[in-house]
Amino acid sequence: MLWLLFFLVTAIHADLCRPDAENAFKVRLSIRTALGDKAYAWDANEEYLFKAMVAFSMRKVPNRETTEISHVLLCNVTQRVSFWFVVTDPSRNHTLPAVEVQSAIRMNRNRINNAFFLNDQTLEFLRIPSTLAPPTDPSVPIWIIIFGVIFCIVLVATMLLIISGIRQHRRKNKGPSEMEDSEDKCENVITIENGIPCDPLDMKGGHINDAFVTEDERLTPL
């Protein structure tokens, strides 16, 4: 009688869990690719851990808090570590909707990956899209970073204003001295008219240009 019951349960499970069955998901693991020489063998203990992680994930879904490890069925396990699994509802003898299983796996994807030391690329749920890892909190608060950036901008702007003011002040100081130098140069310039060197008229000191003084004026004192 017990053997008959065992075969009956096995037949039911085989009908529920099969490749491409309704609400079934295929899983593919690349343990050696991920861990290299530290790769572990996939055995019954690892299968039990996988079932436990799926049951743990399903318990977080509303109205699925009673999910047990025995409700998770695995089938078509290959040596290259790929298999199919379903989550059953023993009370109704059918599999849970794929949408619920998918939601549970996505919410706990990181926990499942960490349990096997894998990631989304080496532990693939082929019909369940990968999820992004939750954002990590920065060690420095964001407001401090923003304040630091603004402070640096204000500091640079202040330095530029100071440098610009110093340059303008220097230009103003150089202006009058350059004008005086140019006037002095103009006063000392000797022009040549008709081959005769002529001194410019000294307007400040009343200097008379000798080129325009007649011989009588030179000999006759004033």
From Swiss-Prot:
Pfam family, one: Collectrin
Extracellular-facing ranges: 15-141
Name of the featured protein: Collectrin
Higher taxonomy: Eukaryota, Metazoa, Chordata, Craniata, Vertebrata
GO biological process per UniProt: positive regulation of amino acid transport
Main location: membrane
Cytoplasmic compartment spans: 163-222
Residue span, Collectrin-like domain: 21-222
Subunit structure: Monomer. Homodimer; dimerization prevents CLTRN cleavage by BACE2. Interacts with SLC6A18; this interaction regulates the trafficking of SLC6A18 to the cell membrane and its amino acid transporter activity. Interacts with SLC6A19; this interaction regulates the trafficking of SLC6A19 to the cell membrane and its amino acid transporter activity. Interacts with SNAPIN.
Signal peptide (from-to): 1-14
Glycosylation sites recorded in the entry for this protein: N76, N93
Domains: entry comment: The cleavage site containing the double Phe-Phe motif acts as negative regulator of shedding by BACE2.
Residue ranges crossing the lipid bilayer per the database entry: 142-162
Reported function: Plays an important role in amino acid transport by acting as binding partner of amino acid transporters SLC6A18 and SLC6A19, regulating their trafficking on the cell surface and their activity. May also play a role in trafficking of amino acid transporters SLC3A1 and SLC7A9 to the renal cortical cell membrane. Regulator of SNARE complex function. Stimulator of beta cell replication.
Site positions (Cleavage by BACE2): F125, L126
Post-translational modification: Glycosylated. Glycosylation is required for plasma membrane localization and for its cleavage by BACE2.
Subcellular localization(s) per the UniProt record: Cell membrane
Positions bearing Phosphothreonine: T214, T220
Family in the record: Belongs to the CLTRN family.
InterPro entries on file: Collectrin, Collectrin_dom
Entry keyword Plastid: no
